[in-house]
Every structure is written in structure tokens, then in C-alpha cells.
């Protein structure tokens, strides 16, 4: 599930697991009264993140029949606006499972021998990738990881075991590579950089096989960002290498948003290596390209994965680069403006986490803690992004020895514990 509410918890308990309220409460280690409150509130109430994770675990452990019952119940449900979004995804996922694997099978078992795959299958995979990207902007990757991985498993099974024409096969490779990128991104946001690195490599290999330059550039750009991750094991040199390769491949692709992204990623790699002149040159290019895109490229003509490349994204890269170069006050000012302007909850939370971390590095501990508390509130309620939590590590370190920092470090440590101690 992307986000569990009382309505989904009730379906999990009653339809999928076939438990009584008391049995379900015992499994979760809570009182039956709490379960009843969730279910009575329905879709208007979201249990806290650690319960969301417990629901995911219960569903993961359930047998195939229980998964099938749960998926069908979601698809048949006829409720409010957020339910519509969930039904779209679950119908898509059921479509994938019907076309490829037994419903909700969590294995790499093969598709039926001799099964034919056509354009409908490819369109279904594309729809799943688009849905994951749209939901990620609102809730973060933590709660989408299971679904993205499940879709990717099914797509790979289709690719490896089904029968299709050469034309459909090429399209299927591209669609599977796109799902690998989606899965890699939500893994990155969930602080599973090992999975992200694996799935980005899968995407790049599929792009090469399919001759899909757009997919190759996308995979290289995501891998570059992973190499530059503040929590990663990569390096600015590796990020620059990947970015330069993507720039070469993208020379004949007409998209100012794409060229803005490549320039912005190049800028932060230069900044991380202390190269101010090349940072200024690259970030200037990014601004020119994104401003051209804003005036000349219609949203309808922009690939969905590039729609996030707007001035706010370039602003984020500029702030990050200036922080690398030691211009902490300038970076903090840019992050603050970006956080206020971001409409998507996940992105706004990530901006504010970067702001808090920068303020802590600059020695403004009180303001860093205040911003950090706001971020923790989002992570506790409606955004699941362990990557964002880890961005707050400098604030946690500063709060440990600061008067008034106790609330922050207690809440931070509680969230960290929910993620198995990783943050």
C-alpha cells in the first residue's frame, strides 16, 4: 500500500487475514479499542508510520490467497477521492498479475509456457510506472517500495519467459527498464541504496538492449544522483563520469528540461570537488535551460519523469552546490525559499530537511532544531522517506548538546528505531 488508512486496515484484517478485531490487535501488540477506532474512522485516519510498516509486514507474510483477496477488495471498493487513486493502481497491478503471474505472487515464477505478450501488457506496465511516480511526490518512497518491487518482478518475468514479436519485445524492454528506474528511485528515497544501485544497473542494461537513449540518460542521471548522495558510498568523480556520459547520449534529444537537469547534476559534482568556476558555469546553464523550458515546452509534451524539472529543482541543486562550497548562508536562504514554494509534501519536507541540516552546519542550532521538528512532524504523519530522515543527522548531533534539543533527538531516535536503526 502507498498509505494505509483505517479503511485498508479493516480490509487487511477482515478480508485478507480473516482475523477478529482481538486477534488483529494481539498481532500488532495494541488494544482492540485502537483497532476499532481506526476502522470506524475509515479513510479519514492514517495510523502512525510504525503501524503502517506493521501492516506491510503482515501483508508480506500472508499467503497468495490472502494477497488475492486483499487486491480484489481494493479494486472493487467504491469510496472517496484517495480511494480512486488506490483503485487505479490496484486494478493496474491486478492487470499485470492476470497477464503475467498468479495474483500477488511474490516470486520470480515463470509466466505460463507459450503465453503471448502484446502492446496491452506494455501499456499496463507504463501505467504502473506513471502511478508510482505520481504517488511518490505526495507520500515518499518508503511506503511504495514493496509495490514497485512487485511490479518490477512481474515485468521481468514477462520479459524472460513470455512470447512476443520483436517490436513488442523492444517496447517491453523499455517499459521494464522504466519500472526498474521507478523501483530504484523509491528504494533511494527509502534509504535502500543497495537496491537502488542494482535496479539502476538493470535499467541501464535494458536501455542498451532496447536502443532507448531516453531511458539510458534517465538511468545515468539517477545513478549520478545516487553517487552524489550525502549518505551514499559513491563519489563526485563517479557522479561526474555518469553525468558526462548522459550528456553525450542526450546531445540529439530536444528537451530543455533534460539539459537543465544534466547541467544541474554536473554543477553539484563540480561543487563537491571544490571547483567553483565550473559550478557557476554549469548552474548558469541549468537556469537558462529551465527558463527556456518554462516558456517553450508544454507540460503535455514533457515526459512524466522530467516534469519535476522546474525552477524549484534547479534552485535545490544551486543550494546544495553552494553548501558544498561553504556558502552556508546563501544555501540556507535558497532552501528556505524552496521549502515555502514547494506544493508537493514529499519535496517540501526534503527541502526543509536540507535547510535544517545546513543551519546546523552553520552553527544556528536553535533554528535548525525548529526546522527539524517540522520535518519530523511530516515524517511521523504523511511522508515516508528514510533518506530525508538521514538528512537530519547533523541536527540530531547538534541537538544532543543543546538546551531545548531533547524533544528533537527523542523523536528522531524513535523514527530511526522504526527503520531498524538506520537513518
Model-derived segments and spans:
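Generic non-transmembrane alpha-helix signal with a bias for helix starts/N-cap capping motifs
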Residues: 6-7, 18, 200, 316
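Conserved binding/catalytic microenvironments
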Residues: 113-423
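Short amphipathic recognition helices of helix-turn-helix/homeodomain-type DNA-binding modules
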Residues: 1-16, 26-28, 36-111, 411-419
Amino acid at each position: 500500500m502507498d498509505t494505509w488508512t483505517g479503511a485498508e486496515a479493516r480490509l487487511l484484517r477482515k478480508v485478507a487475514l480473516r482475523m477478529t478485531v482481538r486477534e488483529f490487535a494481539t498481532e500488532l501488540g495494541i488494544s482492540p479499542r485502537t483497532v476499532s477506532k481506526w476502522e470506524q474512522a475509515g479513510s479519514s485516519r492514517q495510523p502512525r508510520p510504525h503501524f503502517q510498516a506493521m501492516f506491510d509486514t503482515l501483508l508480506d507474510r500472508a499467503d497468495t490467497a490472502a494477497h488475492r483477496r486483499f487486491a480484489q477488495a481494493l479494486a472493487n471498493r467504491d469510496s472517496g477521492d484517495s480511494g480512486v487513486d488506490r483503485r487505479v493502481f490496484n486494478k493496474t497491478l491486478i492487470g499485470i498479475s492476470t497477464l503475467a503471474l498468479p495474483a500477488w505472487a511474490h516470486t520470480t515464477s515463470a509466466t505460463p509456457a507459450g503465453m503471448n505478450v502484446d502492446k496491452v501488457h506494455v501499456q499496463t506496465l507504463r501505467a504502473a510506472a506513471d502511478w508510482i511516480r505520481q504517488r511518490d511526490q505526495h507520500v515518499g518512497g518508503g511506503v511504495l517500495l514493496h509495490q514497485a518491487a512487485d511490479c518490477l518482478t512481474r515485468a521481468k518475468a514477462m520479459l524472460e519467459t513470455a512470447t512476443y514479436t520483436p517490436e513488442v519485445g523492444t517496447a517491453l524492454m523499455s517499459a521494464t527498464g522504466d519500472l526498474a528506474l521507478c523501483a530504484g528511485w523509491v528504494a533511494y528515497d527509502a534509504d535502500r541504496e543497495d537496491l537502488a544501485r542494482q535496479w539502476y544497473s538493470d535499467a541501464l542494461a535494458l536501455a542498451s538492449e532496447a536502443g532507448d537513449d531516453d531511458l539510458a540518460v534517465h538511468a545515468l542521471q539517477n545513478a549520478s544522483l545516487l553517487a552524489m548522495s550525502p549518505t551514499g558510498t559513491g563519489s563526485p568523480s563517479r557522479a561526474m563520469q555518469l553525468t558526462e556520459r548522459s550528456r553525450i547520449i542526450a546531445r540529439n534529444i530536444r528537451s530543455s528540461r533534460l539539459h537543465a537537469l544534466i547541467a544541474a547534476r554536473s554543477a553539484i559534482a563540480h561543487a563537491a570537488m571544490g571547483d567553483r568556476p565550473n559550478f557557476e558555469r554549469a548552474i548558469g546553464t541549468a537556469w537558462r535551460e529551465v527558463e527556456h523550458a518554462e516558456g517553450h515546452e508544454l507540460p503535455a509534451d514533457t515526459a512524466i519523469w522530467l516534469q519535476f524539472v522546474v525552477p524549484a529543482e534547479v534552485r535545490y541543486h544551486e543550494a546544495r552546490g553552494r553548501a558544498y562550497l561553504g556558502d552556508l548562508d546563501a544555501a540556507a536562504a535558497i532552501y528556505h525559499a524552496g521549502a515555502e514554494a514547494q506544493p508537493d509534501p514529499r519535496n517540501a519536507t526534503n527541502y526543509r530537511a536540507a535547510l535544517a541540516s545546513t543551519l546546523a552546519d552553520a552553527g544556528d542550532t536553535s533554528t535548525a532544531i525548529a526546522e527539524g521538528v517540522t520535518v519530523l512532524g511530516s515524517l511521523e504523519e504523511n511522508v515516508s522517506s528514510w533518506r530525508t530522515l538521514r538528512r537530519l543527522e547533523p541536527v540530531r548531533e547538534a541537538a544532543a548538546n543543546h538546551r531545548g534539543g531533547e524533544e528533537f533527538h527523542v523523536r528522531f531516535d524513535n523514527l530511526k528505531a522504526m527503520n531498524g536503526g538506520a537513518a
